[in-house]
Amino acid sequence: MSSFSYAEAGVIGALQGATELFPVSSLGHSVLVPALIGGRWAADLDVSAPESPYLAFIVAVHVATAAALIVAFRDDWRRIITGLAVSVRDRRVTTADGRLAWLIILGTVPVGIVGLLLEHPLRTHLGRPLPAAVFLTVNGMIMLLGERLRRRSTTRGAPGPAGYRDEHTMPIPRSAPVTGRRVGTRPASGPLVAHGSAPGSGPGNHSKAVTTETALPEAEDVTLPEAETALPEAETAARHADRRLAALPRLDALLVGVAQTAALAPGISRSGVTMIAGLSRGLSHLDAARFAFLLATPVILAAGLLKLPDLLGPLGDGVRGQTLFGAIVAGVVAYVSIRFLARWFETRTATPFAVYCLVAGALCVVRFGIF
C-alpha cells in the first residue's frame, strides 16, 4: 500500500481531534472506524501494521492535537514555563505556577517510561478491532464507576486533597504563595468571586460568590499579585484554577500520571482515565478535565515528535499532502473540542461519554467477535 485518500485523511483527522480530548479514546476510534467501514479503509488504515504510512499520519495528527492544546492554554503554559524556569534558577519552588509545572512533569514520567518500553508491542498486538472494542467497553465501565464513587464521596462530604479548594472556595493553595500585594484578614467590601477553569483566554465565564470569612487564608499564608485585579475575568479564572491544581499533593499528581499509562491500550481514553483519577483524588469535574488537558499536552507532543522521522522518511512518501490536510482538520477540531468540553464540565459530568463507550464498545464486540 502506497497511500490513502484525502477523504480518509479528513475523517480520521476529525476523529483524532475530537476523540483525543473527549473521553472516548482516539486510538480506539482510529482502529474501529476504518474496520467498520471496511474495504479499502480497513486495508489502508491499519494501526497494527508494523510498517504503514498510516503510522506517519497518526504522528502528524497527534502533533496537531498537541498544538491545539498549546494554543488553547497558551497563557497557562506561558505562566507554567516561566514558573518552572524561576524554580530551576532559584533551586526552590516559590510560586503556584512553578509547583504546577513540577506536578505536570511528575505526572508525565510514568507514561513516558511505559510508553517507550511497551508502545510498539501494545499497538501491534492490541491495535485490532476486537481488543479495541473490549477496551472501549472497559473504558466506559471505568468512567461510570469513577462517576459513581465521586457522587458517593460528594454526598458524604468527603474532603478533597490536603490544601486543595474547589471552585466553590477562594482557589489559592497555602503551599504555593505568590508575591505581590498583601491580603489582610479584614473582610472585603463585597464577596469574592471564584471562577472555574478556562483554557487560555478560556470559555468558562460562570462565577460563584463566596465570603472571605470561610474561604480566604490568613495574611501570613498568602499574597496576591498587584496586577491580578486588573486582569480579564477569564484569565483571572484560569489563574485561580491553576492554583487549585498546584495545591495537589505530589502523590496525587503521580497517581493521575500512572492512570494515564492505561491509555496506551487502544480503546482506553487518556483524558477519560486521567479525569477519573483526578476525581478520585478529590478534584472537581472542571479541574480534573483541566489537569487532564495540561497533562496530556507534553505526552502527545513528545510522542509525535519522537516519531517525526517516520513522517519525514520513507513511510511518509506519497502521503504528505493527505497528512498535512488531516493534521489541519485535527487541529481545528481539537481546538473546538477543548472549548466545548471546558463549558461542558462547568455543569455536567462524564456519564454521557461513559454510556457511549459502553454501548459502542459492546456493539463492536458483537460485530467483530461474532460476525
Swiss-Prot record:
Coiled coil: none
GO MF terms held by the record: undecaprenyl-diphosphatase activity
UniProt keyword list: Antibiotic resistance, Cell membrane, Cell shape, Cell wall biogenesis/degradation, Hydrolase, Membrane, Peptidoglycan synthesis, Transmembrane, Transmembrane helix
Disulfide bond sites: none
Entry's EC annotation: 3.6.1.27
Compartment(s) of residence: Cell membrane
Superkingdom per UniProt: Bacteria
GO BP of this protein: cell wall organization; peptidoglycan biosynthetic process; regulation of cell shape; response to antibiotic
Keyword Cell wall biogenesis/degradation listed: yes
Gene Ontology CC annotations of this record: plasma membrane
Region annotation Disordered: where it falls in the sequence: 152-226
Transmembrane segments annotated in the record for this chain: 53-73, 100-120, 126-146, 291-311, 322-342, 351-371
Catalytic activity: di-trans,octa-cis-undecaprenyl diphosphate + H2O = di-trans,octa-cis-undecaprenyl phosphate + phosphate + H(+)
Enzyme class: hydrolase
Membrane-topology annotation of the record: Multi-pass membrane protein
Note: Bacitracin is thought to be involved in the inhibition of peptidoglycan synthesis by sequestering undecaprenyl diphosphate, thereby reducing the pool of lipid carrier available.
UniProt xrefs under PANTHER family: UNDECAPRENYL-DIPHOSPHATASE
Protein family: Belongs to the UppP family.
Role noted for this protein: Catalyzes the dephosphorylation of undecaprenyl diphosphate (UPP). Confers resistance to bacitracin.
Entry protein name: Undecaprenyl-diphosphatase 1
Taxonomic placement: Bacteria, Bacillati, Actinomycetota, Actinomycetes, Frankiales
